């Protein structure tokens, strides 16, 4: 088990396999964004090797993210390979859902354990306004097929004042009707997100309890993330809130992040970490990499710091 200086056991890694995306969400990735060269992106065999090394040190859970992970060719082969690594207990995926319907059979065959789908609106015109693509029906079809398959499913919604807050009741209704966890992620007021007004988690909960007075907080955790979950009598699913600003969750953080360029981040909001790509391509042994990772994780920050950030990369890591 890898433990940091504050005795937090690190057993979960989020791996971004690409910085590319087939949407241009206004708060995340505008039209004029520039991308990293393919030669700088970790190859699948490099990602697999990193996970093998980390699994030997106690990492048991892996989340595959992007950008949009499903746009990378043969990503399901990577999922299958990671699933076969001894010690890895769970491999999950976060996607915008555009390609979910077409790729669902391969994802299920690869053994993905759960899927998170990012969806901020159920309205076709609003979806196109927020994302730059008329694909709402495609995403909803993918969600429906995934739900029918029985795979554990979560929806991630970023509530934005004046953009989609009038749909909160519909998101609540989804959690009531379907065995799905609907999670509301607080907007970060950094980078492109500064131009939008976030909705605090307590406002989400106020509206939820107003609509469902008998609602209650769940004591159990659903999955590996920091969300706090609630339900109500008659609900098939749950709602969750992730208060990135107003309710920090640093004291229980159990995760590290690997960027698509091979940089191991200790904290989403910190520049500290380790260039694993340089070590891999520089000929370092597995033991040398393992020792370097163990040492750098000991320096994992106690709490969030918002200084010296690459805001574009932070936003992509938050919402993808």
Which residues make up each language-model segment?
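Accessory C-terminal segments flanking Radical SAM cores
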Residues: 191-305
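Canonical Radical SAM [4Fe-4S] cluster-binding loop centered on the CxxxCxxC motif
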Residues: 5-44, 268
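Radical SAM/AdoMet-radical enzyme domain recognition
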Residues: 41-64, 71-185
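Residues that scaffold the ATP/ADP-binding catalytic core of kinase and kinase-like folds
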Residues: 24, 28, 72, 125, ...
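Conserved small/polar residues in nucleotide/adenosyl-binding loops
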Residues: 307-310
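A short acidic, helix-capping loop that chelates divalent metal ions and anchors anionic groups
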Residues: 33-37, 123-130, 191-195, 275-276
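Glycine-centered loop/turn positions within well-structured domains
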Residues: 23, 124-125, 248, 274
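Cationic, amphipathic, low-complexity alpha-helical segments enriched
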Residues: 314-320
């Amino acid at each position: 088990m890898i433990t940091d200086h504050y005795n937090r056991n690190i057993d979960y890694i989020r791996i971004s396999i690409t910085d590319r995306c087939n949407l241009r969400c206004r708060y995340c990735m505008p039209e004029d964004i520039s991308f990293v060269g393919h030669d700088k992106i970790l190859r699948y065999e490099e990602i697999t090797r990193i996970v093998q090394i980390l699994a030997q040190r106690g990492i048991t859970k892996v989340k595959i993210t992007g950008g949009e992970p499903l746009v990378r060719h043969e990503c399901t082969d990577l999922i299958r390979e990671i699933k076969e690594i001894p010690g890895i207990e769970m491999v999950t995926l976060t996607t915008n859902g555009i390609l979910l319907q077409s790729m669902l059979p391969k994802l299920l065959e690869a053994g993905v354990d759960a899927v998170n789908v990012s969806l901020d609106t159920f309205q076709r015109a609003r979806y196109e306004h927020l994302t730059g693509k008329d694909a709402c029906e495609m995403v909803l079809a993918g969600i429906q097929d995934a739900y029918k398959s029985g795979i554990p499913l979560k929806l991630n919604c970023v509530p934005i004042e004046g953009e989609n807050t009038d749909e909160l009741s519909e998101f609540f209704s989804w959690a009531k009707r379907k065995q799905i966890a609907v999670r509301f992620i607080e907007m970060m007021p950094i980078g492109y997100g500064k131009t939008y007004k976030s909705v605090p988690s307590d406002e989400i909960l106020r509206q939820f309890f107003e609509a469902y007075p008998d609602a209650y907080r769940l004591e159990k955790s659903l999955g590996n993330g920091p969300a706090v979950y609630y339900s109500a009598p008659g609900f098939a699913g749950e709602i969750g809130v992730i208060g990135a600003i107003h309710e920090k969750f640093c004291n229980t953080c159990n995760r590290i992040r690997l960027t698509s360029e091979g940089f191991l981040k200790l904290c989403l909001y910190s520049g500290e970490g380790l260039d694993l790509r340089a070590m891999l391509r520089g000929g370092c042994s597995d033991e040398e990499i393992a020792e370097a990772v163990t040492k750098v994780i000991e320096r994992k920050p106690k709490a969030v710091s918002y200084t010296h950030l690459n805001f574009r990369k932070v936003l992509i890591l938050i919402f993808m």
